[in-house]
Amino acid sequence: MAVFFRALKACYEATGDERIPAALEKHFLSYPPQDRNSVRWIINVEGILWTYAITGNEALLQLAESEWLRSNSALTQENCLDDNNFNMHGVTMNEELKVPVLLYAYTGKPQYLQAALKADKKMEDANMLVDGVVSSSEYLAGQDALASHETCDITDYSWTMGYFLMATGDASWADRIERCMFNAAP
C-alpha cells in the first residue's frame, strides 16, 4: 500500500479527485490493528500524513505518531537515537528513514528531527559509498571497496532525502540528492 499511495497521490495532484483522499482516510482509519504489525507497515506513515494534510483529520496525525512509537520495524525512535550501527535491509532503511523526518514536518516535535538526523548520520557514516548512495546488497553492507547497492536504494534514498530537504529547508539535502542521481542513477 505504501508505494501504491504514491500513484494515488500523483493521480490526486493531476486531477483533484476528492474521492482519493477520502478513500485513503477511510482505509487508514479502518485498517485493523492486528494487520499493522508487519515490519514494513510503518512506511504507510508517509501516506497517512499526506492524507492528514489534505483532510485535516487529527485522527490520522495521531495514528501516524502512535504507529511510529509502537512500531516493531527495524527502525524505531529508540534505535535512531542510540549509538549502535544499523543492521537491516538497505531498501527498508532508506524507506523507513523518512518516517521521523515526516513526523517532524507535520508535528514540529524536535525529538523526531533529532531521531531522523542521528539515524541518517549513523547510516551514512557506516555505509555511504563514493557515488552518494549507501551500500546495500539486501542488507546494509559497509564501505568496503567491493560493496554495492541495488537500484531501488537509489530511488528510495533520494526520495527520503527530498523529505529531509522539505522538512529542514537545508540545501545540503539537495546536494545529496544531486550526488546520488548524477553518480548512481542508471
Can you annotate each of these PLM segments?
Residues 1-186:
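Glycan-recognition and catalytic cores of secretory/periplasmic carbohydrate-active enzymes
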